[in-house]
Amino acid sequence: VDLQFKGPFIWLQRLVEVMSLQQQGCIIQISSATAKIMLDNHAAYMGTKAGIDHVIRTVANEFGEKGIRANTISPGLTDTPMTADALQSPALANAFAQCYPLGRYGTSDDIAAAALFLASEDCFMTGENLQVNGGLNLRRNPRAHELEEAMIKAGEIPAPE
């Protein structure tokens, strides 16, 4: 909770102080599709991301008149160092990819492109949560037992006795 909510909250407080003096700014916070979509065994993570989404909306509302825009980006599963272990399992990678209408999970380039748009002068958005997750929010994440079954079927882990 300290890393996922308290740290960003304190950072946002300081950032808004500086941007208020400058009468401009653009805040882009990374959230997660799990703020809205369930993922087994991730309650604290999901809750902190939902909390950050709400804090960003509050910042956008309270500081918009000072020229500050604030938005979040919500990736789904994205090929990054944080997910590297999970994606090494072909069964897990495939189980997650099947949940995405676009047929794949995201890349850091997908997230960077969204951030560039949000940071651009052409962006007339504030207080928004940009879902950059290949349509995952139209479906759902696989359940823990479904992931386990996929790994057993692929021979990656033994079946329980």
Predicted regions and their residues:
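Conserved Rossmann-fold SDR core element
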Residues: 53, 63-78, 125-132
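Alpha-helical segment proximal to the catalytic Tyr-Lys
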Residues: 17, 61-62
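Active-site helix of classical SDR
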Residues: 12, 48
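Active-site loop immediately N-terminal to the catalytic Tyr-X3-Lys motif
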Residues: 37-43, 65-66, 103
